[in-house]
Each structure stands twice: as C-alpha cells, then as structure tokens.
C-alpha cells in the first residue's frame, strides 16, 4: 500500500500574525511525499527528506501518525519527501510538506480525501511541532487549493478565493538574512495590516501585498528598499513573504529579466509562476 502526493508552496499577500487574518497564493514550487504502509501493528514511522537528508523528518512523521490516529489503524510507515521549495524561506515549505504527507497517507490507506480533514491534520501536526504561530490556515489553503485564498486564520475559514492571471511570473529572492520572528513587534503593526487586508478583501491584491511587505519588513528589520527596487525594475508588486527572509515580486513576462537583475544583487533568485492547480494524489 503506497501513495504519492504533491502540494504547493505559497507566497504571502497578507501575513496573519498581526491580526489573525491573512492571504496567500499558490506558486509552482512543490513538495512531493511518498508513503509506504507496513502492516506490522507497531505504528513506527520513519521519514527522510531525499533532497535535504540533514532535515529532521519530525513534521512529516507526525502527519502520518496523526492520520493513523484519526482512522484508528496501527500500521507502520516509511515516508520520503522531495521538492523545490527552499526550507525556512517564507514560501510555506512546512505547509506544503504537511499537506502532501497527510494527503499521501490518506491515499495509501484508501480512504476518501476530505480537504477539511487534510488541512486540519496538517495544521494540527504543524502546531504540535511548533512550526506555526497562527496555524497558517491561509498558507495551508493556498498550498492545498492553489490560487489566492483570503482567510480568517483564527476560525479556519476561507473568506474568499481568487486567481492571479496566467501571464504573470513570480520572482523569489532568497537573501542570506537572519530569520526574525518577533511576534511582539508584529503585533504592534496590527492596525496598519488591517488597512492592507481591506485592500485584499476588495481584490486589490497587488497593493495589499506591497503594503504588507513594507509593514512586516519594517517590523522585522528586513530592508524595505528591496520591494521598491523591484517596482523600479518593472514589477507589478513585491514584498516580504511570510516572516522572511524571502521576498516575492510579481511581474509580466517581458519584465522578468529586469526584475530578476534588480533582485539578484541581494541574493539567490528563483523564477516561477502562480499556480491554480493545488495539491493532488499522483498515484
């Protein structure tokens, strides 16, 4: 009994830490999880990240165990992951890994896939591994469904779904900045993030993303000029993704090189695109 599933990375439109309300969009970077069940009654789960063997597999192992607990089975399992989402980059690698792990395990068991259950078990696992502050429901839903999701993270409700147009490129900057998750400083900007979220609810995602990026980069001591540099080079919008250190810039195809050149002086870049496809079982 085996199953393979993939889930997307995501970029931030509104970071939910300050207010509990957030928004994210799926990007065409993925993590694939392969699960093999062992019918020995021992409930031992062993995981490995194929492309990053030093990464502790505790999150995906927890996901498998939580699925087993939910369905009250006593299998053991092997789980491996591989993907192209940089770890701890603000591109929702943990949401993608947990979604893919839960989905693959449910598939291996032959159970019906319920998106709400997948998300609940994935978020539960992330909380138990201390990998999330808010539950990251916005990131998890963008990773699972693709497209844009606007969410009440506190109540785990999707308030709105939308899509970016297909003629847009996403340029991801991954600078060598030290990650900073100062929740108290992020709470200070709550009222201003609310204003950016209002833009998001009105469908003005580009302005929302830019304003959110300025606010959170200031609160977390990341450079805000990077986003302005991207605009100067032709980007439609740009901003910090998650709590950083990555930035995302959206641009039209013809401006891709100019925007990439403006960003790559700060660090490594990856070019991708929005994805509206979402998570799926491969086999």
From Swiss-Prot:
HAMAP family per the UniProt record, alphabetical: Shik_kinase_arch
Entry keyword annotation includes Transferase: yes
A Pfam family annotated for this UniProt entry: GHMP_kinases_C
Pathway: Metabolic intermediate biosynthesis; chorismate biosynthesis; chorismate from D-erythrose 4-phosphate and phosphoenolpyruvate: step 5/7
A GO term, aspect molecular function: ATP binding
Binding site for ATP: 86-96
Family according to the record: Belongs to the GHMP kinase family. Archaeal shikimate kinase subfamily.
E.C. no: 2.7.1.71
GO aspect biological process, one term: chorismate biosynthetic process
UniProt KW keywords: Amino-acid biosynthesis, Aromatic amino acid biosynthesis, ATP-binding, Cytoplasm, Kinase, Nucleotide-binding, Transferase
SUPFAM superfamilies noted in UniProt: GHMP Kinase, C-terminal domain, Ribosomal protein S5 domain 2-like
Name by which UniProt lists this protein: Shikimate kinase
Catalytic activity, reaction form: shikimate + ATP = 3-phosphoshikimate + ADP + H(+)
PANTHER family listed in its UniProt record: HOMOSERINE/4-DIPHOSPHOCYTIDYL-2-C-METHYL-D-ERYTHRITOL KINASE, SHIKIMATE KINASE
Classification via InterPro entries: GHMP_kinase_C_dom, GHMP_kinase_C_sf, GHMP_kinase_N_dom, Ribosomal_Su5_D2-typ_SF, Ribsml_uS5_D2-typ_fold_subgr, SK_arc
Subcellular location per the Swiss-Prot or TrEMBL entry: Cytoplasm
UniProt keyword Ribonucleoprotein, yes or no: no
Enzyme class, first EC level, given as a word: transferase
Encoding gene, per UniProt annotation: aroK
């Amino acid at each position: 009994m085996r199953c393979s599933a993939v889930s997307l990375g995501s970029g931030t439109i509104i970071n939910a830490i300050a207010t509990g309300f957030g928004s994210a969009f799926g990007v065409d970077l993925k993590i694939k999880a392969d699960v093999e069940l062992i019918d020995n009654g021992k409930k031992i789960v062993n995981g490995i990240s194929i492309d990053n063997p030093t990464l502790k597999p505790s999150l995906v192992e927890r996901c498998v165990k939580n699925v087993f607990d939910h369905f009250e089975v006593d299998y053991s399992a092997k789980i491996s992951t591989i993907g192209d989402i940089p770890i701890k980059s603000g591109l929702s690698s943990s949401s993608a890994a947990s979604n893919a792990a839960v989905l693959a395990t449910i598939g291996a068991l032959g159970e019906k896939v319920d998106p709400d259950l997948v998300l609940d078990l994935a978020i539960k696992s992330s909380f138990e591994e201390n990998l999330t502050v808010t539950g990251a429901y916005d990131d998890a839903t963008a990773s699972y469904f693709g497209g844009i999701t606007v969410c009440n993270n506190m109540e785990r409700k999707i308030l709105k779904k939308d899509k970016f147009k297909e003629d847009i490129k996403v340029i991801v900057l991954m600078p060598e900045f030290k990650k900073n998750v100062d929740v108290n400083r992020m709470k200070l900007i709550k009222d201003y993030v609310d204003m950016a979220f209002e833009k998001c609810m009105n469908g003005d995602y580009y302005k929302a993303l830019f304003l959110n990026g300025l606010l959170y980069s200031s609160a977390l001591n990341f450079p805000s000029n990077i986003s302005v540099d991207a605009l100067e080079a032709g980007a439609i919008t740009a901003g910090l993704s998650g709590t950083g250190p990555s930035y995302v810039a959206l641009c039209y195809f013809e401006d891709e090189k100019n925007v990439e050149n403006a960003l790559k002086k700060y660090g490594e870049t990856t070019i991708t695109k929005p994805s509206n496809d979402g998570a799926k079982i491969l086999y």
